């Protein structure tokens, strides 16, 4: 004989089972959320990092903006940046468009605003032309460092200092858009003869061409008349004659050092270049 369970009992059991399942589901979900939150918190802590135990020597609170020249990009500072950072400085290496002087100046001004003052500007090669203009009347900038760089006076252009007729045949290549770059086969010997050959080949491959119209663009009022300056002469430079560099150093009344370096001094002599920049952070007011 079959026993029948009353319908009301079945309904009550159904409610109990349903409630149990819901509670179990919520419990699992809550546990998952807690674990996920804990994982997120751990990830956040890892991304923020624990306070570094490394002792820094930055007592000046001076930030640094590095400005490359033509035929290179911001990666040319890759050996200098860690030295400056390890000394406790905030560092930005810009990527110049190299389409016009105005665009390049604007790029550096944005970097100054981003990093905040006080700031030391460092220019290599054409980068010196740019910082001369970008720092003018900018109260955040406290000093200028020129590395084998152009330091023009008002009204001067790159064409005042570069004589294309004296360059080796085939040295420069101009593309259909009017952008200039160095023949990769001649890059190392003309620009970076003291750089490891393998690295020089990489530099040639990633070189950044510039709009040839930049050669004729004139400098505005120079910031080096307003600020303390430092200059590094590359004694073995084949891109800018060392005598021209010495002329610039004298013109801007710079604290000057000379290195037995190619034009690519930030790459071949990063320690000496970094030390000059660090000296500037201490000497600028």
Q: Predicted segment positions?
A:
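Bacterial N-terminal signal peptides
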Residues: 16-29
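Active-site nucleophile elbow and catalytic-triad environment of alpha/beta-hydrolase enzymes
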Residues: 202-223
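Conserved loop-alpha-helix segment in the C-terminal half of the alpha/beta-hydrolase fold
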Residues: 235-267, 280
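Active-site loop/oxyanion-hole signature of alpha/beta-hydrolase fold enzymes
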Residues: 90-120, 133-136, 159-163
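Gly/Ala-rich beta-loop-alpha elbow adjacent to hydrolase catalytic centers
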Residues: 122-127, 131
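Short beta-strand/loop motif that positions the catalytic acidic residue
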Residues: 231-233
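Conserved HGGG/HGGXW glycine-rich cap/lid loop of the alpha/beta-hydrolase fold
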Residues: 60-101, 119
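Flexible "cap/lid" loop of the alpha/beta hydrolase fold
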Residues: 140-141, 145-184, 211-214, 248
């Amino acid at each position: 004989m079959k026993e029948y369970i009353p319908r009301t009992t079945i309904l009550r059991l159904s409610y109990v089972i349903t409630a149990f399942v819901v509670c179990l589901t919520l419990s699992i979900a809550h546990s998952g959320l807690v674990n996920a939150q804990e994982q997120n918190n751990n990830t956040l802590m890892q991304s923020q990092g624990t306070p570094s135990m490394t002792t820094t020597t930055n007592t000046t609170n001076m930030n640094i903006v590095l400005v490359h020249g033509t035929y290179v990009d911001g990666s040319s500072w890759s050996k200098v940046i860690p030295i400056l950072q390890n000394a406790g400085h905030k560092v930005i290496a810009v990527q110049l468009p190299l389409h016009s002087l105005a665009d390049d100046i604007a790029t550096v001004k944005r970097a100054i605003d981003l990093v905040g003052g006080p700031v030391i500007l460092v220019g290599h090669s054409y980068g010196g032309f740019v910082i001369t203009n970008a720092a003018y009347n900018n109260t955040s900038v406290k000093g200028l460092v020129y590395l084998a760089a152009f330091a023009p006076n008002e009204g001067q252009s790159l064409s005042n200092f570069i004589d294309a007729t004296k360059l080796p045949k085939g040295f420069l290549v101009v593309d259909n858009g009017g952008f200039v770059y160095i023949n990769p086969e001649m890059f190392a010997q003309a620009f970076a003869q003291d750089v490891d050959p393998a690295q020089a080949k990489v530099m040639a491959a990633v070189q950044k061409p510039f709009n040839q119209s930049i050669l004729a663009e004139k400098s505005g009022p120079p910031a080096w008349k307003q600020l303390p300056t430092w200059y590094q002469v590359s004694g073995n430079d084949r891109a800018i004659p060392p005598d021209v560099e010495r002329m610039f150093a004298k013109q801007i009344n710079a604290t000057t050092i000379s290195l037995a370096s190619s034009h690519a001094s930030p790459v071949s002599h990063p320690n000496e270049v970094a030390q000059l920049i660090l000296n500037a952070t201490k000497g600028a007011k």
